[in-house]
Amino acid sequence: MAEQDINEQVIERLKEGAGHIINMFKSVFNTPIGMDGRRALTFTAAIAGYACHQAVKAEHGTFAVVTTNDGRNFYFGDDLNKYLLENNMNVVGFFTAVSGIGHETVLQIVKDCALAVGKDQHTVCGFNPNILYKEISECWDGIFENMTSRFCEKPSEWPVLFGIVAQNILIMSIDGGAPKDEASMVAIESAVYMSKMDCDSVLKNG
């Protein structure tokens, strides 16, 4: 069977699984006046970035580690960028496919995130990155057995699954009135920043 056919079959399977996760997040972020689009977008894009990091770990890939003055570690490198930026089905590509944001803008966001990691008072789209990381990691653990591992056959599919989820939330946010480019940049920043974090990236009192 051709590789393209295999990829199409995988994507269709992951889209079906993503639908269940999307419905869960729509319920989680529902408010009396509708879905909290910005929070839902930040969270789902962040978990897509987190999925990139977890896929590298699960496949025993290599990180380039940057240690801050206060002893926290942040993670970079080619193996991470493969899922985040480079594969045919990379996470950031799910967002640029919606908005048409160009390569130079994406590159600037990536650079800005690299410069911002670990800095005091830095927020990820208005959210404390330490708190966001804790929420993301708890969610990941909570749905991994019943959803992620059920819908995905191997770790390399995790970023694709959650990229599809976040792309759909992005589209919903735009349909709800969010400016297309601004919403897309929120998604990109959230995914890129969270992909750099692990448990040793978090301030102990953060």
Describe the role of every protein-language-model region:
Residues 2-206:
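Solvent-exposed interaction surfaces and binding hotspots enriched for charged
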